[in-house]
Amino acid sequence: MTADVNTNSDLVMKRELLGWLDAQRTHVAEQVRAMPAEARRRSVVPSGWTPRGLLRHLTLDVERVWFRAVMAGEEVDLPEGYAGWIASEQDSDEELLEKYADECRLATAAIGEMELDARPVWWFEDGGDPPHSSLREILLHVIVETATHAGHLDICRELVDGGQRLVLDEPTT
């Protein structure tokens, strides 16, 4: 009986964590869409990132790396160094948003049947041990990272056009 209860509670917890992650993913996409097009291509911070670059970073360095490469062990193309932060001028804003949405769907599908206690199956050859030891920890990390970057986009948007987003996110179900 205890195993069934634990498995059921893990399924509920996983669904809740994915719901919160989806809420943050939506926050990111909404803020990028809400910005004036020219503002998506320029930086307003000393580090030099742009909203388009941040979107690409979340697509490749976060969703693809953590879920498809690290957890699922898929052999996927990964950017090197800071290349994930550089959005090609060839990609339209809508294409970058579509790539982000597609990668989020692929990431969610890749971990679909995994238990929260599942261990990473891949890590960078020269990177030592993975910093997180389970899908649960990786989900929490990605939620925090995505929410942090959503906040960066909130600030960017307010600086460029004064727009503000009231953060009353609820998990998707």
Model-assigned labels for residue ranges:
Residues 4-8, 14, 18-33, 37-84, ...:
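Short, contiguous alpha-helical
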Residues 12-17, 93-97:
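Active-site rim elements
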Residues 84-123, 134-147:
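Acidic/histidine-rich alpha-helical segments that form the ligand environment
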